[in-house]
């Protein structure tokens, strides 16, 4: 058991008999005195794949479930399945494209370090990505010499099809660092 304010992204909870994986959390602090902070959580139902949204007060208890995390690397595509290989014992983990559609936007060709699969009692639940990823821009408006001092953004398309806002001075072919959860530009990659 954990309080709602202790729940983090990537944790699993048992809610009304459903096994739910926490995808996103919004914290809402009401301005009225004495009002408790609300936590709006977006879940993915592990069994059905449906998205579920619930609100909790900070002191409400939730039934957490212990998950096993295994480090993996992207291996290959087999039809509509994506195969990830365990780094230690080379166990293959197969995901259907629909299961990891959002995550695929952040996985560059050849994979990325820091990926993990979440399992519970041998059942494959989800693919978890690291906080950031370095990607190459394939298309964006040309950079402007002497761009204004104000921070203006423009859309940029990555090699995976992901579109995010980047500063005006960034040009195609540059590698940038992206915060995965917030889908935002963090800076140029090393």
From Swiss-Prot:
One of its GO terms (cellular component) is cytoplasm. Belongs to the elongation factor P family. This is Elongation factor P-like protein. GO terms for molecular function: translation elongation factor activity. GO terms for biological process: peptide biosynthetic process. InterPro entries: Elong-fact-P_C, NA-bd_OB-fold, Rib_uL2_dom2, Transl_elong_fac_P/YeiP, Transl_elong_KOW-like, Transl_elong_p-like_YeiP, Transl_elong_P/YeiP_cen, Transl_elong_P/YeiP_CS. It comes from Yersinia pestis. It comes from the Bacteria.
């Amino acid at each position: 058991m954990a309080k709602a304010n202790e729940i983090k992204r990537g944790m699993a909870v048992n809610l009304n008999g459903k096994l739910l994986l926490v995808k996103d959390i919004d914290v809402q602090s009401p301005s009225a005195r004495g009002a408790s902070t609300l936590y709006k959580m977006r879940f993915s139902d592990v069994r059905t794949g449906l998205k579920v949204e619930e609100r909790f007060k900070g002191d409400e208890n939730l039934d957490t479930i212990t998950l096993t995390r295994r480090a993996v690397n992207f291996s290959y595509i087999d039809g509509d399945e994506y195969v990830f290989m365990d780094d230690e014992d080379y166990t293959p983990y197969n995901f259907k494209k629909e299961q990891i559609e959002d995550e695929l936007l952040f996985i560059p060709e050849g994979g990325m370090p820091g990926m993990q699969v979440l399992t519970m009692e041998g059942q494959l639940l989800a693919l978890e990505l690291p906080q950031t990823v370095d990607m190459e821009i394939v298309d964006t408006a040309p950079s402007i010499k002497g761009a204004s001092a104000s921070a203006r953004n423009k859309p940029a398309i990555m090699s995976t099809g992901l579109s995010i806002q980047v500063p005006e001075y960034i040009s195609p072919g540059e590698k940038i660092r992206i915060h995965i959860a917030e889908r935002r530009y963090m800076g140029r990659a090393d």
